[in-house]
């Protein structure tokens, strides 16, 4: 095989459709665009979302809410997951090491879900009201 002998597979390339070359071609005069109107003109097509001057959908629909930038780095941990951490004090680094939270997590909150059967000491982790009661009832403590 040589570079000068390489060719496309048969039927892989279609001939370009030449328009505006007489009635007999089937694509003469109007070239398949029909008569008059915006879509028959050169460069005549609306932008995406244009509804003919009517207020477009993306502007009619009400806007609400926002995405908190802090929430992107916040992760929730259940009470029963804290038993999987084998250190004296549970902090963000210990939770990452135990593979309970991803490395990108900056803020962690413990929520009251599941049972806590051993006392744990939390450091630098937010706690819900129900989780705080459960941790203190199990003999644990929460440091800020």
UniProtKB/Swiss-Prot annotation:
A Gene Ontology molecular function term of the record: structural constituent of ribosome
Domain of life from the UniProt record = Bacteria
Q: Does the keyword rRNA-binding apply?
A: yes
Chain positions covered by the region annotation Disordered: 1-52
Q: Which GO biological-process labels does this protein carry?
A: translation
Q: What keywords does the record list, in alphabetical order?
A: Ribonucleoprotein, Ribosomal protein, RNA-binding, rRNA-binding
Decide whether keyword Ribosomal protein is in the record: yes
Q: Where is the composition biased (Gly residues)?
A: 21-31
This molecule's function is given as: Binds to the 23S rRNA.
**HAMAP family on file:** Ribosomal_uL15
Name of this chain's protein: Large ribosomal subunit protein uL15
Q: Which organism is it from?
A: Nitrosococcus oceani (strain ATCC 19707 / BCRC 17464 / JCM 30415 / NCIMB 11848 / C-107)
């Amino acid at each position: 095989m040589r570079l000068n002998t390489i060719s496309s597979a048969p039927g892989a390339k279609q001939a370009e459709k030449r328009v505006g070359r007489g009635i007999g071609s089937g694509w003469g005069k109007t070239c398949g665009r029909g008569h008059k109107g915006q879509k028959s003109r050169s460069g005549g097509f609306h932008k995406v979302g244009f509804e003919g001057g009517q207020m477009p959908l993306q502007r009619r629909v009400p806007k609400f809410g926002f995405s908190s930038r802090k929430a992107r780095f916040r992760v929730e941990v259940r009470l029963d997951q804290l038993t999987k951490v084998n250190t004296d004090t549970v902090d963000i680094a210990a939770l990452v090491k135990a593979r309970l939270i991803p490395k990108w997590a900056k803020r962690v909150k413990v929520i009251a879900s599941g049972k806590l059967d051993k006392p744990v000491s939390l450091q630098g982790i937010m706690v819900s009201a129900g989780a705080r009661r459960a941790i203190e009832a199990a003999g644990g403590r929460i440091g800020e």
